[in-house]
A protein has these predicted regions:
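Amphipathic, small/basic residue-rich leader segments at the start of a protein or domain
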Residues: 1-124, 148, 579-580, 586-598
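Alpha-helix capping/hinge segments and adjacent helical runs
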Residues: 2-5, 89, 182, 259, ...
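Internal maturation/activation junctions in enzymes
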Residues: 65, 78, 126-130, 141-183, ...
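C-terminal amphipathic alpha-helical interaction region
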Residues: 99, 111, 457, 473-598
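A short core secondary-structure module
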Residues: 187, 191-241, 245
């Protein structure tokens, strides 16, 4: 298994120099997050993830979760690691101080979540789902519900889930069958079965708080008739502690390709006592708070597993000796040269590096917007951040997982045949990553959300909010001595982006299938442009530090070289995505369903 080391240098480069989190924190009134405190948190977070979580990654995959008559036991060491995580204060790092949290910015919490996910993705899903449940209750719960649940969730005594999917419906939640019948005491009797519930049952906390989508008896049809309910595993008693067992049980756990140490459960609700959160029939709006949190978290999984894969691949490429360089021996005192000298191996490694570092920049850029949306005093500033988040969230989820899967595949390929062998650990990263483009809304659904709802649905407003940022950036740096060629390339694509969007929108007015046909290519096209913008932001800082004679010259040179690789070898993929978009829907829809197979 690759030995994980938190990429603190790259993290600090983004935090300190590219995005200047510290100035942002000061402007948002989050002065408690001082540079010294942030540095200490990063160091301690790295130690915990490297020394506690990473050693459990392979063993957790080998052992998996155990199911026995409704009881789920997590792999050896998981429960103890969670206790250490909670004791160290990590669980409430960015949570509201009113409920026992430390109140630090969301962006700092996201940096720690990257370390957690890279060191042990399966383990990280348990606290990750809880943070999502906390966000939904905090945003939509009554004061009584907040007082009852948030302190326990923040403290890590209780954990949370979200329960959406049923056997007959995943994407189409409007046809769920789970029902909630009003009771005389104001509660609801929730009945039905949910599947694919991550962390639905386990032994890591005293109680599990399920957020469940269900329909009231008189609910309107479709998604406008969905309500959200808090359904605890153990009902809180008068003292606020876990009391009587509720009528919710785990029927089984799934046997999966990857993330085997994360318990994926079938949950049965047999008249379980539930409590309405938010307004009746407005549950999907409430759940979207948690779903958007989960979608950003899922996008992070692409980055996290890609980082772990790159660390294994770069070490192997420097150690593995095979053949001689085409330009002559590079290690003449050895039997062969290390494979890192070969162009095709470098192609894979640089692709991994460019996507990982670009995706990290995208994640931190998005996290900084989360800070603004939550903390800014100015309403206009908050709304602008919310609009950008709405636009970026489906891109973060889908682009980062598509490229993350590509990165883990490259990592396994660098190892050759050894990558296919379990003991090296590279194939586990591929298996763990494969679910990321599927759950929390498939990437096809994310693409429809982006193009249909966010871009065309806003009449282009959300897209223009971002393209204006890029346009301003390009105008300011058009004459940059070393980078003006890349700036011009980005500027051209940014202008083309709007024109291409208009073309798709016009075609969709005549044929709605045009949106579905173009959506995924449109999302990937958008992702490549966004990463180009972020790579140039990193390159500008790196070049400025080189010009100033800063001590990190080698690191900055590497940044500039990787930026050049991205612009020359990866950004041109936009051309193929554009061609596919412009090809339209006819070639997809003309073949009758009965002729797909004979």
């Amino acid at each position: 298994m690759p030995e994980y080391k938190a990429p603190l240098r790259d993290m600090r480069f983004l935090i300190d120099h590219v995005f200047d989190f510290h100035s942002s924190y000061a402007a948002l009134g989050a002065s408690d997050a001082s540079p010294d405190m942030v540095a200490a948190i990063l160091e301690e977070g790295a130690k915990f993830c490297e020394n506690v979580l990473a050693p459990l990654n392979r063993s957790g995959d080998e052992e998996g979760c155990h199911f026995d008559n409704g009881v789920v036991t997590t792999p050896k060491g998981f429960k103890q690691a969670f206790a250490q995580y909670v004791e160290g204060g990590w669980h409430g790092l960015a949570a509201d101080p009113s409920y026992g949290g430390q109140g630090l910015p969301h962006s700092l919490g996201l940096v720690i979540s990257e370390m957690v996910g890279s060191s042990n993705t399966s383990w990280g899903m348990y606290p990750g789902l809880t943070h999502g449940a906390m966000s939904a209750i905090h945003a939509h719960g009554s004061e009584e519900q907040k007082q009852t649940y948030l302190s326990k969730l923040t403290a890590g005594q209780w954990t949370g889930t979200m329960c959406l999917t049923e056997a007959h419906c995943g994407t189409d939640l409007g046809i769920i069958k789970t029902r909630a019948v009003p009771q005389a005491d104001g509660s609801y009797a929730v009945s039905g079965s949910k599947i694919f519930i991550s962390a639905g049952e386990h032994d890591m906390s005293e109680n599990i708080i399920h957020l469940v989508l269900a329909k009231l008896p008189d609910a309107p049809a479709g998604t406008k008739g969905i309500s959200l309910f808090i359904v605890p595993k153990f009902l809180p008693n008068a003292d606020g502690e876990a009391g009587e067992r509720n009528a919710v049980s785990c029927g089984s756990i799934e046997h999966k390709m990857g993330i085997k140490a994360s318990a994926t459960c079938v949950l049965n609700f047999d008249g379980a006592k539930g409590f309405l959160i938010g307004e009746a029939n407005k549950g999907l709006n409430c759940m979207f708070t948690m779903m958007n949190h989960a979608r950003l978290g899922t996008g992070m999984q692409g980055l996290c597993l890609g980082e772990a894969s790159f660390q294994g691949a770069i070490k192997y490429a420097n150690d593995r000796l095979q053949m001689r360089s085409l330009t002559g021996p590079k290690a003449p005192d050895k039997a062969a040269d290390p494979i890192i000298v070969h162009p095709d191996v470098r192609r894979m490694l640089l692709t991994m590096k460019a996507f990982n570092e670009g995706n990290r920049a995208l994640a931190y850029f998005t996290a900084q917007l989360l800070d603004v949306a939550h903390l800014a005093a100015d309403e206009t500033q908050r709304q602008d951040a919310e609009n950008l988040l709405a636009f970026l969230t489906p891109i973060c989820k889908a682009f980062m997982t598509e490229t993350g899967l590509e990165v883990t595949n490259h990592g396994m390929q660098v190892f050759g045949g050894h990558g296919f062998i379990r003991e090296w650990g590279m194939e586990q990263l591929v298996r763990d990553c494969r679910i990321a483009p599927i759950y929390e809304g498939t990437n096809g659904i994310q693409a429809l959300d982006l193009l249909g709802r966010k871009v065309l649905g806003s009449q282009g407003k959300l897209l223009m909010g971002f393209t204006k940022i890029v346009h301003k950036f390009c105008a300011a740096n058009a004459e940059h001595l070393q980078l003006k060629g890349h700036v011009a390339q980005l500027n051209g694509l940014n202008q083309q982006w709007g024109a291409l969007t208009t073309k798709v929108g016009m075609a969709a007015m005549k044929n709605p299938d045009e949106v579905g046909a173009a959506a995924l290519d449109y999302l990937m096209y958008s992702g490549y442009i966004i990463l180009a913008y972020l790579w140039l932001r990193m390159a500008l800082v790196a070049q400025a530090r080189l010009d100033a004679g800063e001590e990190d010259a080698d690191y900055c040179q590497a940044k500039l070289a990787t930026c050049e690789f991205y612009f020359k070898r990866l950004l041109p993929r936009t051309a193929s995505h554009q061609a596919a978009i412009e090809a339209g829907s006819d070639c997809l829809m003309k073949l009758p369903a009965e002729l797909f197979a004979f």
